[in-house]
From Swiss-Prot:
Main subcellular localisation: endoplasmic reticulum
SUPFAM superfamilies named among the record's database cross-references: Nucleotide-diphospho-sugar transferases
Motif (Prevents secretion from ER): 589-592
Biased composition (Basic and acidic residues): 552-563, 579-592
Identification of the protein by name: Glycosyltransferase 25 family member
Length: 592
């Protein structure tokens, strides 16, 4: 915020005086309808904005609610209203949709007209109070970057929107508009959305979170009302964001979208017939998961937390779910627990075997011997202690499955991100797999290493036959699959777990390694598309590897014995490690 402070230097004779100017005033305009599920987070992030609240005024309107939106807004304002320069909150308490609406997500002309009237009222209110800026923002936007408002003001642009991220291709700007005023696909859209080109970009449309400078004379011509446009020029729909965009166009005022920073997140508006308890709550889970991935936590003020219900937890119809995590990686564990709370997953933390606690002697004493001739395909090195610990962690789970007679288990690592609609998609994958039968393992997340297409499983829309793959981010394994993996006594001919699995389903390119394993009958499938991806890739900021960045084993000297007959029993006795939305050409909306 210090970067925004303006200083004026006055020189009088030999004296020089520096004076500090106050920051511009901003009126924040919000329309609220049926947003009880988003408001606790929306208000928390709005409150977190690093901008002087005594330079901000709030203008909030709400009507036709069927939830606790008004109650939540009142609760937040009760605590915060005194912090802001002024608060203007009006609402209609009668519940239910308009008589002309088919559903609460139906956008008809009456609804558009009401929103147009309210936004025009907000614009006029900002002008009447001589605000320097008006910031229109929807109640399902989460401005996770606390510097958003200040950074936008620094741009000194007449109309600017912070680019917002959704759980798909949807965002709050258009790069093209058709002759009949609707969304047009362009090559530039994805370049901006994917940060392939970064900066401030002139576009024909911004919406959902828009900052307007009221000190620019031409902005007096901006309007949401069709009647205020030049006579005879507009023949488009009754739609607030389109009319506003065209009023800017007719007035010669450029609109910009700014993607120089990650500013925040946006919900995709519901289509007519879609519901808040269904689709929108799933979308909220997706977006909140994105935020947890990026920041490690959510902003939720204590007085608003009572409006957020706990998500009931289950095991996705499986016998058990395990998360492998090193005890010392508390930040990963904390992040994953937040994901499980959001997704409603009942998961047991399974302490990983820590490679840092292993030594050549410990490994040898545990009965572990290494596959003759093994070297990492990329780094041409023997196994690291981290890779040994990783294998033992998975191995211990397979042993526990057999001991406890667990029929189907999901094994998760702790450096994963969940794809949108994870629960629904996971249930779909599992339903297909059980209906078809004949599988031992299903990858939920992996790195595919073969270029050729993988064959679809007959009768399934979600499953393919797994080819040579790396990573064990997440997989479902059956009891029979665990028994197959244990029967080969892999600790007597050890190699990394993500090499062992493809060998066991007989799809590994190294015939020399494969020849050491006889019963390669593991039936392995993969979800398609995948349900899990890594949080970071090699080289990314924040990337940490507990397998690569660890000591390597001492390569055995010629003549050393490579196998012990009872490696699993010795290990057990050691006690170590136990215990996408796309864009539509029609206008999609979310306000009142």
């Amino acid at each position: 915020m210090l970067a925004l402070l303006l200083t004026t230097t006055i020189v009088s004779g030999d004296n020089q005086i520096e004076l500090t100017e106050q920051l511009p005033t901003v009126m924040v305009a919000v329309l609220v309808r049926n947003k009880a599920h988003t408001l606790p987070y929306f208000f928390s992030y709005l409150e977190d904005l690093d901008y002087p609240k005594d330079r901000m005024s709030l203008w909030i309107r709400s009507d036709h609610n069927e939830d606790r939106s008004i109650e939540i807004t009142k609760a937040w304002l009760k605590r915060t209203s005194s912090l802001y320069h002024s608060v203007d909150f009006k609402y209609r308490s009668e519940r239910g949709k308009r008589e002309s609406e088919k559903t609460s997500t139906h956008w008809n002309e009456e609804r558009f007209s009401d929103v147009i009237r309210l936004k025009q009222d907000a614009l006029q209110a900002a002008r009447m109070m001589w605000a320097d800026y008006i910031f229109f923002i929807d109640a399902d936007v989460f401005l996770t970057n606390s510097n958003t408002l200040g950074k936008l003001i620094e741009r000194k642009l007449p109309i600017v929107a912070p680019m917002l991220v959704s759980d798909g291709l949807y965002s709050n700007f258009w790069c093209g508009m058709t002759s009949d005023y609707y969304y047009q696909r362009t090559d530039d859209y994805k370049k901006i959305l994917n940060y392939d080109q970064i900066g401030q970009w002139p576009v024909p449309m911004v919406h959902t979170a828009v900052l307007v400078s009221l000190n620019i004379a031409q902005t007096r011509q901006l309007t949401f009302e069709r009647k205020n446009l030049p006579v005879g020029r507009y023949d488009g729909p009754v739609d607030d964001i389109i009319i506003f965009a065209m009023s800017a166009n007719y007035s010669g005022i450029p609109m910009y979208v700014c993607n120089e920073l990650l500013y925040g997140y946006i919900m995709v508006p519901l289509e007519a017939g879609e519901t808040v308890p269904g689709k929108d709550l799933e979308q909220l889970t997706n977006v909140l998961s994105y935020i947890v991935n990026e920041y490690g936590a959510l902003s939720l003020k204590q007085d608003l937390s009572r409006f957020v219900a706990d998500v009931p937890k289950d095991k996705l119809s499986l016998s058990h779910i395990y998360m492998i995590n090193l005890e010392r990686r508390t930040e990963r564990r904390t992040k994953m627990l937040k994901h499980f709370d959001l997704l409603g997953l009942d998961v047991e933390h399974f302490p990983a075997v820590d490679g840092k606690q292993l030594s050549d002697k410990k490994v040898y004493d545990m009965g572990i011997r290494f596959l003759p001739g093994y070297a990492d395909p990329f780094h041409k090195r023997p196994m690291t202690m981290g890779e040994i610990g990783c294998f033992l962690s998975h191995y211990n789970i397979w042993e526990r499955m057999v001991r406890l007679n667990q029929q189907e288990v999901l094994v998760l690592e702790d450096d994963i991100r969940f794809e949108p609609f994870f629960r629904r998609r996971a249930y779909g994958v599992l339903a297909d797999a059980r209906r078809i039968g004949g599988w031992d393992l299903i990858y939920f997340g992996r790195k595919r290493l073969q270029e050729e297409d993988e064959k679809w499983i007959d009768g399934s829309e979600y499953l393919v036959k797994a080819g040579y793959s790396y990573w064990t981010l997440g997989y479902v394994i059956t009891l029979e699959g665990a028994k197959k993996l244990l029967r080969e006594q892999p600790l007597s001919k050890l190699l990394p777990v993500d090499e062992y699995l493809p060998i066991m389903f007989d799809n590994h390119p190294n015939e020399s390694w494969t020849s050491h394993f006889r019963d390669r009958t593991l039936s392995a499938w993969s979800a398609a598309p995948l349900l899990l991806y890594p949080t970071h890739y090699t080289g990314d900021e924040g990337y940490i590897s507990d397998t690569e960045d660890s000591l390597r084993i001492q390569e055995p000297k010629k003549g050393d014995k490579e196998q012990l007959p009872n490696a699993p029993a010795l290990l057990s006795e050691s006690g170590i490690g136990q215990g996408e939305h796309d864009l539509e050409t029609k206008n999609r909306r979310s306000e009142l």
